[in-house]
Amino acid sequence: MYDDEDEMVNDPMDGDYIDDSDEISAEAWQEACWVVISAYFDEKGLVRQQLDSFDEFVQMNVQRIVEDSPPVELQSENQHLGTDMENPAKFSLKFNQIYLSKPTHWEKDGAPMPMMPNEARLRNLTYASPLYVDITKVVTRDDSATEKVYDKVFVGKVPVMLRSSYCMLSNMTDRDLTELNECPLDPGGYFVINGSEKVLIAQEKMATNTVYVFSMKDGKYAFKTECRSCLENSSRPTSTMWVNMLARGGGGGKKTAMGQRIIGILPYIKQEIPIMIVFRALGFVSDRDILGHIIYDFNDPEMMEMVKPSLDEAFVIQEQNVALNFIGARGAKPGVTREQRIKYAREILQKELLPHVGVSEHCETKKAFFIGYMVHRLLLAALGRRELDDRDHIGNKRLDLAGPLLAFLFRSLFRNLLKEMRMTAQKYINKNDDFALDVCVKTSTITRGLTYSLATGNWGDQKKAHQSRAGVSQVLNRLTYTATLSHLRRANSPIGREGKLAKPRQLHNTQWGMVCPAETPEGQAVGLVKNLALMAYISVGSLPEPILEFLEEWSMENLEEVSPSAIADATKIFVNGAWVGIHREPDQLMTTLKKLRRQMDIIVSEVSMVRDIRDREIRIYTDAGRVCRPLLIVENQKLALKKRHIDQLKEAADEANKYTWSDLVGGGVVELIDSMEEETSMIAMMPEDLRSGGYCDTHTHCEIHPAMILGVCASIIPFPDHNQSPRNTYQSAMGKQAMGVYTTNFHVRMDTLAHVLYYPQKPLVTTRSMEYLRFNELPAGINAIVAILSYSGYNQEDSVIMNNSAIDRGLFRSVFYRSYRDNEANLDNANEELIEKPTREKCSGMRHSLYDKLDEDGIISPGMRVSGDDVIIGKTVALPDIDDDLDASGKKYPKRDASTFLRSSETGIVDQVMLSLNSDGNKFVKIRMRSVRLPQIGDKFASRHGQKGTMGIMYRQEDMPFTAEGLTPDIIINPHAVPSRMTIGHLIECLQGKLSANKGEIGDATPFNDTVNVQKISGLLCEYGYHLRGNEVMYNGHTGKKLTTQIFFGPTYYQRLKHMVDDKIHSRARGPIQMMNRQPMEGRARDGGLRFGEMERDCQISHGATQFLRERLFEVSDPYHVYVCNNCGLIVVANLRTNSFECKACRNKTQVSAVRIPYACKLLFQELMSMSIAPRLMVKPRQSKRSKHQSEA
């Protein structure tokens, strides 16, 4: 049945003979688009971009890196004798096929065990798979070669991304996952490194191999063309070439009369080279020849005029060798012969200049054409015929995901491995003329390198940590399920956070549908940290070879065979930035290319093809990191998506050979479009726009649903299109801090911190996108009954009044888990660690805490109630036997206490204790403590519209206002919270929620949905006998009198946020002080003081409150006594026991004064003295009161 239908889809005559009954009506569209979206998420999920990228890395990149590495070639060098050996043995090692097995853990006894992710989390292991490679060893002795193949040599471990195809959990059913203690809803897409979950954040960068023209505001250059060229999957760093046009009068000197010259900046060459000299160095000598490569049409006087100054400048140099010498002299180190300089210049032109065009011999023509194209673009921009490029256009950006990031790392680590291998093998060869392979492969290089970067987030070599990028790998946010999803779809721009540039932070038009417009952090990173929109996908990259072969067949003319004059009328073709040829029939070519892509034949669906008709260019991109999104294909103003597709998707839920998203892509119904191609498409917002008589009759695509422009966090907001935009941004940040159920297996996990809400509810008012975020299964909030009124004044300034009785029934009650961990580290035999119960007889340094809560094995037992500073894990460290380790009492202790204590500010119950062995085979404990958190005054709550507030007071139900029906609100918020913030969505949500509660079905609040509006909701509410705008008559709870106004009243979804008073309350009278300056410590965790800062000081000075000032800044901070010599004013040596003083500077022992200054001041004086600056304290003799009176008299 399906086969003939598929043929119908692919039939080009499609639109003509199928009758209109198969079209989707406007009413059915509301459902149809969600069927398509569901098909997308069923197949792709929300973290597909991470998983695909990692799979690409393992399946393709690793193999490519290993194969591309040159063989290790060695020969025995005679060490001591001066004579050379006649024919030393030659050795060569070549790497072939690689293998990655399932994640494995080797126990200390050496037995390999398959490892599950949860075991890795609990035991602080790294979830990694061993990597094996086949090595061929060729030994040549006396002209006879012997070859030996070593199968599957272990070279290191590669961390595995959860749920990728190499993970144990891939393709498991929910039942299997549950048996493994994994959450079936967990999306994967992260790594487990030493027991902690790490995400790789996508890194934004400018696209390589593309020509950009920028104008320079006020510099030496008027325009600058750059091409950052980089060979696909090679280890070479990018080499950038610039072609710049000097500003008028720029470049100084007498040449200004000549006009604007064009110069090139080549890699490894210190000075700028006139562009004509570069052409001559490439072997194009005559002026006409060069101009042909730059200006394709000689009948263009303006452009000819622009290049004239450059021709005049290079007039002196006419042959290729002179030009090469000119370039070589400006790069090579001085004092080399002319031949060497020419050779050096040739080498640079071949290998370093524009490597993506070619690095082999005889690429001169291609390179000349490409440089000519760069100059041509520069001239077009200078003449104002083509607009400048936009740095912030998302099509000019690439996102590096796990794949490219890990490939970059693996490439350098593998190179190091080869280096170490060569050195070790050379040693063995010199000693005994042969070597064993397994001794030379240092497996820890790759293992440690990958683990280090993923664990710390410093992306690059450990030794050069300061140059590497920081924060590439982050600990996965596990506060709420939403926070987890959002973290896995984040992208980061590596621009300094300090820069005040507004441009890169602004929302760019091209980000529509690719980047969420609401979800970005507030503060310094605003706009630099982005989140992907729901249906955005990032290309993993494919090989350009099939496309190049196809173009060859389809009459593309190669640059080597083209005469420059032919280029003017033809269309240039670029593949991944490299100019590969020209074509005479661009229209036909594009149609064929698109058709092939829609049939997924030769061309992969994620390849993008752009035809720039005005500039006569066709650009084809197959590289990784382009952001793209699916759109519905429109042909002849009709959707390619028909009713039958929808029916097939609907009924496919249970069949084995079901109709899926891939079939839609393969059937030419939807396609992936990146933002470059989007610019050349005409996209309808809704299928209604395709009706005839619209403002456009050449639509090429149609949006699936406009709500898909939002990201994970913004998709939870009901009616976001009725809120002021910053409010949606605030909610996107707060939704990540709401409490809920963050994963269904939280009881078997040992997370450092975890909050779980007691009775989470799914919202009464939902958006359609929520079902893909699993918000209904793992919600983070409660439908509270909310009244908006000012009642008693305890809800001013964004505070809320809560119903105490509702809290007693469990409203917003949550449980808080915190884990503590410790292990016996065996550093060396001298100080051996033991987990045991410390005793006061044997241990020094024991605190005044309760050690008796510990069991005999030194670990507290589950169910114990613990409070601040109690011991949870007893641990002792053996002290080495030295005699000077005596205590003040003169007692010698064999051990020192190293126990773990509960945080001083917390109380709770020991929930779970886990004993295990860690990766080193040492004993290892994790203890989870739980405490119940009731909502209390000062805790933070928020609705889903950025309306956050703290609890101001709790009233019993009797004191709350009530409606005529006898309903009392759970929460009362202040009316002043709404008007100035314009969160109308909040009010509509309340109205819709009221209707839903009456109607008994979930309300729809999907954005950009015109079918739901206030008029309709109000009309339906009226039918249930309520006021049409949701107002109700209420009675004062204290007096029973009717309130004079009607109150807006109904259910609203509220979230409890993680900021709780119990975690913040802090005060200090006396406490610990810092070693260095003897001032109080900082921070609540260290029982620190509250800083009386510069601004506070300035206020007290302006008050003139000197005694208070002295007390704060001196008496209660760091008072100190110093003794000062009266003669020279320097600090003297004082011995208070014998009461003897001596000034070392002037040998004075009697004239000494005691001075009280802050200890920090004393420290400053001594630091100044160490720099040979003498701060002298000049002291006056203190007058007695009597002498004072006499002097006044």
Curated annotation (Swiss-Prot):
A zinc finger (C4-type) spans 1125-1146. This is DNA-directed RNA polymerase II subunit RPB2. GO terms for molecular function: DNA binding; DNA-directed RNA polymerase activity; ribonucleoside binding; zinc ion binding. It comes from the Eukaryota. It is found in: Nucleus. Belongs to the RNA polymerase beta chain family. Its EC number is 2.7.7.6. Keywords: DNA-directed RNA polymerase, Magnesium, Metal-binding, Nucleotidyltransferase, Nucleus, Transcription, Transferase, Zinc, Zinc-finger. PROSITE patterns: RNA_POL_BETA. The keyword Hydrolase does not apply. Component of the RNA polymerase II (Pol II) complex consisting of 12 subunits.
